Design a protein with these regions (language model features):
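N-terminal, membrane-interfacial amphipathic/helix-forming hydrophobic leader that caps
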Residues: 1-72
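Membrane-interface helix/loop boundary segments of multi-pass membrane proteins
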Residues: 134-159, 192-199
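Juxtamembrane helix-loop-helix connectors linking adjacent transmembrane helices
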Residues: 35-48, 70-138, 144-149
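Residue-level signature of transmembrane alpha-helical entry/exit and packing/kink sites
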Residues: 10-22, 42-54, 84, 88, ...
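Functionally important transmembrane alpha-helices
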Residues: 179-199
């Protein structure tokens, strides 16, 4: 059994099955996982169902890799995940604080009111958990990783970044500039981070 993040090259048929089938499977599952946030009014119920859906997506990915790639799932190692998640949260908060700070200095961001609702925060924290899990499985866990293992890093970065950006063109108020920005800043960056940290 190959115990690395990347398996040796598959046969073309098996690679196509994992690549196309995996993307289709998790895109559909991800769509269903967003239902609680979109259609359930109660914040606590919606948040809890979103959390359950996110965990199920992770279990599905574990099943896919174990069943068809027959390797240790290094990218979902709990020992690495807890530490890396904490570091990721810290960097994420620092970057968001920097962006908001720049916006405020430029006069583009103003606080006109302040309130705090624990249930509301819980709901959307869990909703974004589903978004993060779903997108990372599809674009990094499957698309980027399989392209990188079968071809090379540049092919994986370019294709996954373009598709990642294109998937966000349907966002409210999205523009060509914002889509290109997501492709370059997020698609490429997250691909490189996945390659470096292997998680």
């Amino acid at each position: 059994m190959n115990k690395t993040l990347y398996t040796s090259k598959f046969s073309l048929g098996k690679w196509c099955f994992l690549f196309i089938g995996g993307i289709i499977l998790f895109t559909i599952a991800y769509a269903f996982a967003t239902i609680p946030e979109l259609y359930i009014g109660n914040n606590w119920i919606s948040g809890t169902l979103s959390l359950i859906c996110g965990v199920l997506l992770l279990l599905m990915y574990r099943w896919l890799v174990r069943s068809y790639e027959e390797r240790k799932i290094e990218e979902l190692s709990m020992q690495k995940s807890l530490k890396d998640t904490g570091i990721g949260f810290l960097w994420g908060m620092l970057m968001m604080a920097a962006v908001i700070g720049i916006f405020a200095l430029c006069g583009w961001y103003k606080i006109i009111g302040c309130s705090f609702n624990v249930a509301f925060v819980y709901r959307y924290l869990m909703a974004y958990f589903v978004v993060a899990v779903g997108e990372e499985i599809v674009f990094r866990g499957i698309m980027f990783r399989l392209l990188d293992s079968q071809f090379n890093l540049w092919v994986a970065l370019i294709i996954s970044a373009i598709v990642f950006g294109a998937a966000h063109i349907i966002n409210p108020n999205a523009t060509v500039v914002s889509t290109v920005g997501i492709s370059l800043a997020t698609g490429v960056l997250f691909g490189l981070l996945f390659k470096y940290y292997r998680t």
